[in-house]
From Swiss-Prot:
Cell location: Cell membrane
Protein name: ATP synthase subunit c, sodium ion specific
Function: F(1)F(0) ATP synthase produces ATP from ADP in the presence of a proton or sodium gradient. F-type ATPases consist of two structural domains, F(1) containing the extramembraneous catalytic core and F(0) containing the membrane sodium channel, linked together by a central stalk and a peripheral stalk. During catalysis, ATP synthesis in the catalytic domain of F(1) is coupled via a rotary mechanism of the central stalk subunits to sodium translocation. Key component of the F(0) channel; it plays a direct role in translocation across the membrane. A homomeric c-ring of between 10-14 subunits forms the central stalk rotor element with the F(1) delta and epsilon subunits.
NCBIfam families xrefs: ATP_synt_c
Protein family membership: Belongs to the ATPase C chain family.
Length: 89
């Protein structure tokens, strides 16, 4: 009976951890929206620098999005390929 309880606790903690990992995806979304807004403001002020501004914004958003992708991968691992259940035996 103790093993069933242990697996239940591990699975519940993994679900909570996956939820926390997905909450971490909020940060990149807010940051990307802020960066896009500032890029639009910059293009409105200096239309001749549009190419440089857009390329810099896209590079920054690609780097910021990697955080969201990592949190998604961690959540999927915790939910579907949980390494901690195998440690219980």
């Amino acid at each position: 009976m103790d093993m069933v309880l242990a697996k239940t606790v591990v699975l519940a903690a993994s679900a909570v951890g996956a939820g926390a990992a997905m909450i971490a995806g909020i940060g990149p979304g807010v940051g990307q929206g802020y960066a896009a807004g500032k890029a639009v403001e910059s293009v409105a002020r200096q239309p001749e620098a549009k190419g440089d501004i857009i390329s810099t914004m896209v590079l920054g958003q690609a780097i910021a999005e990697s955080t969201g992708i990592y949190s998604l991968v961690i959540a999927l691992i915790l939910l579907y390929a949980n390494p901690f259940v195998g440690l219980l035996g």
